[in-house]
Amino acid sequence: MTNNTYTLNEVVVTTDWLSQHSADSNLRVFDCTTHLIHQSNPESDAPYVVQSGKDDYDKAHIPGAAFIDLQQDLSDTTSPYRFTCLQANELADKLGALGIGDNTTAVLYSQTTPQWATRIWWLLRTVGFDRA
């Protein structure tokens, strides 16, 4: 017998919850969409290129949401490896600039696969933020 009950329901919100809390001054909603585009370039070592989801965000997003560009805003762009985590103090500063603070509740979503919102959720956890 399997138990299909989701046990971490405090980290997932419903559209009803979001609608009820959309006017909360401490709520920040972020579109975290990123695309990995497969490339068949024999000259490149990378099997894919990273493409920001900003164009998708510009076309449509949850009202009041802001956009987080994972690769450009929250990753070490000097690293030879994609999506390398920033140093904790730099990451905290970047998150603060996005309006994420001690009393903030952050809702993260991706328009494609959930891994991008999940990645940013984990980054928030690395600096001790647990209200996402």
Describe the residue ranges of each PLM region.
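Cytosolic catalytic domains that perform sulfur/thiol-centered chemistry
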Residues: M1-A132
